[in-house]
């Protein structure tokens, strides 16, 4: 064990030396070194303690930061109303482009974390960093990822929500072991009309289960996605209006029949109220049912 500790110290000292003496070269080689350094941080507590001085984050712009540098960069703008520092990250810049842009539009920074051990490192850093959370940019709407204030209220009635859920669910693909849930957010008329998000917790558990046999339970669970409708957007409002108009057209003859039936019932009740019980015929009683 002493030999192992000595080797760990020598390796960490050498990496720190390179970082201090030639940081540009260290950054240039970081993508090649990252897997080795992250593995050491995850498996050796002493190596972690040394590595936090030179381990790097890389953002989507290709800039590198130490953990402390990045914390200082984002702390003023990416702290939520509960005092939690929120680290936004992406695992695929191309697939998650629109979500990254939504974060940038808010002035937020996004980390690129697409490595083999990044999901495990994230779990470790959340335990090490005080009042901090890592969330992927597509795991919720940007206002919910870093909640600065109470969300704008959705003004749809429960009946309108149910109708819109049916409209959109009817157009969704039927995929094996995949579930879609239609949800509603008031995101502003300039935000996207729809967004597809996936729970950070469940997605992370599924990713970790692929590498840890003991977590296979999560791997067997169906993928779950939220199809978020922005109720402030003109397109969503248009869909709602058209749905209500189409529904009204189909309901008109039914409502007319109901009103006619109610009028006949009222006339029968009035007529029967003037008769004694034994004067009401069997047919009249049947007409009231």
Model region roles, listed by residue range:
Residues 1-289:
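Conserved GHKL (Bergerat-fold) ATPase module
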């Amino acid at each position: 064990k002493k030999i192992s500790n000595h080797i760990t110290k020598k390796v960490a000292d050498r990496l720190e030396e390179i970082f201090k003496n030639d940081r540009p070269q260290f950054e240039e080689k970081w993508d090649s070194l990252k897997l080795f350094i992250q593995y050491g941080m995850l498996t050796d507590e002493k190596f972690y303690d040394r590595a936090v001085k030179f381990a790097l984050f890389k953002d989507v712009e290709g800039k590198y930061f130490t953990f402390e540098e990045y914390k200082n960069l984002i702390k003023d703008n990416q702290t939520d109303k509960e005092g939690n520092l929120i680290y936004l990250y992406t695992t695929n810049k191309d697939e998650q482009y629109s979500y990254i842009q939504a974060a940038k539009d808010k002035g937020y920074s996004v980390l690129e974390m697409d490595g083999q051990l990044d999901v495990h490192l994230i779990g470790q850093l959340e335990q090490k960093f005080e009042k901090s959370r890592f969330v992927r940019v597509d795991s919720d709407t940007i206002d919910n990822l870093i909640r600065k204030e109470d969300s704008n209220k959705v003004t749809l009635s429960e009946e309108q929500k149910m109708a819109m859920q049916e409209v959109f669910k009817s157009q969704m693909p039927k995929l094996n072991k995949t579930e879609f849930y239609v949800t509603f957010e008031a995101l502003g008329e300039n935000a996207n009309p729809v967004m597809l998000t996936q729970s950070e917790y469940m997605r992370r558990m599924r990713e970790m289960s692929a590498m840890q046999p003991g977590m296979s339970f999560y791997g067997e669970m169906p993928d779950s996605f939220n199809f978020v409708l922005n109720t402030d957007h003109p397109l969503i409002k248009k869909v709602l209006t058209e749905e209500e108009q189409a529904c009204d057209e189909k309901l008109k003859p039914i409502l007319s029949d109901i009103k006619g039936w109610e009028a006949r019932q009222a006339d029968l009740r009035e007529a029967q109220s003037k008769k004694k019980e034994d004067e009401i015929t069997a047919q009249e009683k049947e007409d009231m049912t």
